[in-house]
Amino acid sequence: RYWMHMAHHDNPAHVGIRTKTHKLIYFYGCNYDGGYQTPPGWELYDLATDPHETINLYDDPNHAELVADLKRQLAETRKRVGDDGSHYPAVEKVVQEFWDYDLKDRQKAQMISREFLKRRELELKAGKRNIKTHQGFKEASYPE
């Protein structure tokens, strides 16, 4: 699990699993209190044919069985290592909400994406953005 979220590295929160040939990543995209920051989504890469991870195969019907198997493995691994969501229940709620990534989930993710874009454009236009720290929110300015 990548825990830094958007707070310091501008990298959406995610979990994933990797085999010798494939990598499945779930960008659940919320901060530790469950607030939506980036749109949730899944990515699947064939590391043998696409080592630079440029072609997302998640929606390819030829990989549906592999996606289901890797999701099962990811869920089992999370359980085995104690990543059951109990420490961050708001995050786990978002993780579970978008786990299946059906049409309804995708539509909601698109809405979140539009909201994120609007918020980000306003922040950049103003020359600053909110940076979430462990102490709360603080304003950060960028040099011109």
Residue spans for each PLM region:
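C-terminal cap/loop subdomain of S1 sulfatases and analogous C-terminal strand-loop tails that border
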Residues: 1-43, 47, 52, 65, ...
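Intrinsic low-complexity, glycine/proline- and repeat-rich
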Residues: 98-144
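Phosphate-coordinating loops and pocket residues in cytosolic domains that bind phosphorylated ligands
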Residues: 59
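Residues at secondary-structure transition points
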Residues: 88-91, 133
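Short amphipathic alpha-helical coiled-coil/interface segments
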Residues: 70-74
